[in-house]
Amino acid sequence: MKKVLDETLESSPIIKRGEYNYFIHPIADGVPLFTSDLLRDVATRTIQRIDTNIDKIVTAEAMGIPIATAISMSTDIPYVVMRKRQYFLEGEVPVHQETGYSKGELYLNGVEKGDRVTIVDDVLSTGGTLIAVIKALEKAGAEIVDIVCVIERGDGKSKVKEITGYDVQTLVKIDVTENGVVILESN
């Protein structure tokens, strides 16, 4: 039986932005429709891959939030969202982020030295967001136990490994053509 994530990816609309084929999917964009069965599939598959003996789940805004919420509700592990705006809280860790399409700052709050954490995110493409999250967690003194991204596209996984030394698990690896999403690997 096909997984809900795989089915919805294969039916994703494709838009062209310059030379880039961009897929529109609820996990990455929140549209066209984010169903409970899709979120349940993603959360269940992620939980099966992680060590749940952790203190916190960490994600970056925005589309990692529903994933972290679903995992948190299923495991009773609290989660922290790295935000794009500064809150000026004590212990806040700022870090610069560069992705394939944007640059900016991310701010980590709510993680203490020695916290065991798992990072979850929606899409891994260039690795820029994930590298920034890892750097912030290292600055905070957290122990990164697992990293799971739902969708892998591009060379970000190898870039994250090369720059940070961390392995990233993904649920699906895709390619996007003008004809649609091609699932290269489904875990």
From Swiss-Prot:
Q: In which pathway does it act?
A: Purine metabolism; IMP biosynthesis via salvage pathway; IMP from hypoxanthine: step 1/1
- EC numbers: 2.4.2.8
Gene Ontology MF: a single term: hypoxanthine phosphoribosyltransferase activity
Subcellular location(s): the record lists:
Cytoplasm
The GO annotation for biological process reads: IMP salvage; purine ribonucleoside salvage
> Main role?
Catalyzes a salvage reaction resulting in the formation of IMP that is energically less costly than de novo synthesis.
| Family of this protein | Belongs to the purine/pyrimidine phosphoribosyltransferase family. Archaeal HPRT subfamily.
Assembly with partners or alone:
Homodimer.
The protein depicted here goes by the name: Hypoxanthine/guanine phosphoribosyltransferase
This protein's encoding gene: hpt
